[in-house]
Amino acid sequence: MMETKATLRGVRLSAQKGRLVADQIRGKKVDQALNILQFSPKKGAAIIKRVLESAIANAEHNDGADIDELKVTTIYVEKGSVLKRFTARAKGRGDRISKQSCHIYVTVGN
């Protein structure tokens, strides 16, 4: 059994929102997964679609895989670094804003 990976690190998307999309395509055939991502309104869907397309291209180019046979064997989204920012509030105060990032890992195989 052959498996091919693709990763995207440091994406400006929270891991929680990325996991919502990743859970929808885990275990599906790649053409079905691409179709789900194509019509999903979520921001994470477009990002994960790019990573999945990269994994498919890697499988085709590096391993000579047949695209029709490929499935999303594993997909997971991990928490990345957090950018801490401040926004001005009333009476000279400031509130912290944390800008989340994540790492996306996709593996396709037979």
From Swiss-Prot:
The keyword Amino-acid biosynthesis is assigned to this record: no
BP-aspect Gene Ontology terms: translation
Sorted UniProt keywords: Ribonucleoprotein, Ribosomal protein, RNA-binding, rRNA-binding
GO molecular function, one term: rRNA binding
One GO cellular component term noted in the UniProt record for this chain: cytosolic large ribosomal subunit
CDD domains linked to this entry: Ribosomal_L22
One Pfam family from the record: Ribosomal_L22
Role summary: This protein binds specifically to 23S rRNA; its binding is stimulated by other ribosomal proteins, e.g. L4, L17, and L20. It is important during the early stages of 50S assembly. It makes multiple contacts with different domains of the 23S rRNA in the assembled 50S subunit and ribosome.
NCBIfam families referenced in this protein's UniProt entry, alphabetically: rplV_bact
Protein name, UniProt field: Large ribosomal subunit protein uL22
Organism annotation: Janthinobacterium sp. (strain Marseille)
Lineage: Bacteria, Pseudomonadati, Pseudomonadota, Betaproteobacteria, Burkholderiales
Name of the encoding gene: rplV
